[in-house]
Amino acid sequence: MVRNMKMKKSNEWLWLGTKIINAHKTNGFESAIIFGKQGTGKTTYALKVAKEVYQRLGHEPDKAWELALDSLFFELKDALRIMKIFRQNDRTIPIIIFDDAGIWLQKYLWYKEEMIKFYRIYNIIRNIVSGVIFTTPSPNDIAFYVREKGWKLIMITRNGRQPDGTPKAVAKIAVNKITIIKGKITNKMKWRTVDDYTVKLPDWVYKEYVERRKVYEEKLLEELDEVLDSDNKTENPSNPSLLTKIDDVTR
């Protein structure tokens, strides 16, 4: 499938970051769906792309990492709040990352009011954001409306380790090409290039990301607990232990 892929560019910057930078400087737009098995480095790649974008816009590396973290969202409403502020001030956001987007942007929820609003915004999103990245274990988790507009499809796979033991990964990038076959317009993905990178973030960046994700996951668990409580009013758990003795479990 990737046999005819072009060789990786020789410069130091990630290919996707370069595309988003070019879009930001020319009032263009880039969107990408990053997928791969859990733990392969999807979020790491997305954050490294965002960091490079901000660094190339003139920010120092540490500040660029901060902005990259602040550009990553777990929930749609948080991103929409920022987008609204930028739109009101006639400014364009360089990049937004929707991490684990399949959780809320899944194809089975396309009819929800929140999703319908997002689809409407996505039609004009290029006026607000230069680059949008979605991460998900599988692109099939995401609603077709968004998938068909994902002009870059990026598959993340592990690729060994560096001498110091740091895991490496490769981002295989496919570009969506519009073709006309027998009078019909079709979209066809063509493998274009690769980005090689290490699956490692600065310690403080990783810790901050983990902390933000923890807050989001705890909120998800609370919401799920509320749903289950509303469906089942009984106070008697089927598993009375509930692994409450954490020390015994993790010894």
Swiss-Prot record:
The keyword Nucleotide-binding applies. Signal peptide: none annotated. ATP binds at G36, K37, Q38, G39, T40, G41, K42, T43. Residues 230-251 are annotated as: Disordered. Keywords: ATP-binding, Nucleotide-binding. GO terms for molecular function: ATP binding. SUPFAM superfamilies: P-loop containing nucleoside triphosphate hydrolases. The keyword Cell membrane does not apply. This protein may be involved in virus assembly. Essential for virus function. This is Uncharacterized protein B-251.
